Amino acid sequence: AIGSFYLIVFAVIAAAVYSSTSIRYVRILSLGSSWLFLGLITLMWAGAFLSEGSSVGEFFTTFALLGDYFVNLHNFILPINDYHEFYLYWWFAWSIMIGQFTARFVSGIKTYQVLAAMMIFPSIPIGIWFTVLYYYSANAIPVTGISNLAMVFVGTTFVINSLDSLVRLYTDNLNLTVKRFGKTKYFIGNVALLSGLTLLFKLDFLQIQWVGALAIGLILGCFGYILLAHYRKVVEIKNSPKENKIDFNKIELVN
């Protein structure tokens, strides 16, 4: 069982590294994973609310229960416990990558539009997804066969998509690119690096709390440096330079 687990992890890492060799692959996987998720929601929704003994009306009744989350939000926030700690440190650990990666694709978009695109609009399908999952759990509906396989496949695709974006980002930042080393050396080097880091997380000294704390320190350090050294330059920024706009048609032609 342990051997199979590491084999799956290695396959996911290898797929993510290969996808990161081209921004075209990253884009295809990103769009593909989103459509697969919507397809999974549709499949699970139909299995729950179009089956015998159920109705579409029960979906709306269950969906309305999401309002209780906001009414009782204070109970989920305080007191802070180990769950909050783990989630927050995980969020901070990913925030640097997510922020920098997103910044490359939001040229010309206002801050409120970025907020809507990344937090508000995605919350709608996620809300529907958790409504469906809750209905399955509350009514003891078994998840078997194609539904179970679809959940595993979509979940794995999302992991690959997240990881290939991370690989693409740090290789560009450190100039460890395919253009510099070639696809074979790039692939082998990054697979070895990520596999090694994955194994290190089995050790007690490397935990998400430490990684998250390091990320918080980096964020605060960079923010302080910008305020002290580049404040005037930053406040003069009105919008993203035109040269930062990405033309995906040109990317597809190059690839």
Show which residues each predicted segment covers.
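Membrane-water interface regions at transmembrane-helix termini and the short interhelical loops
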Residues: 1, 10-33, 101-111, 201-208, ...
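Hydrophobic alpha-helical segments and their helix-loop junctions in multi-pass secondary transporters
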Residues: 1-5, 38-68, 224-239
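Transmembrane alpha-helical segments of multi-pass small-molecule transport proteins
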Residues: 1-22, 88-100, 150-153, 183-201
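Helix-loop-helix connectors at the membrane interface of multi-pass transporters/channels
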Residues: 1-7, 101-124, 166-191
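Terminal cytosolic tails of multi-pass membrane transporters
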Residues: 108-115, 130-149, 165, 169-181, ...
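A conserved active-site cap/scaffold subdomain adjacent to cofactor or substrate pockets
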Residues: 74-116
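Membrane-interface loop-to-helix entry segments
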Residues: 20-46, 116-119, 208-223
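Extracellular/periplasmic helix-loop-helix junctions in multi-pass membrane proteins
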Residues: 138-144, 199-216
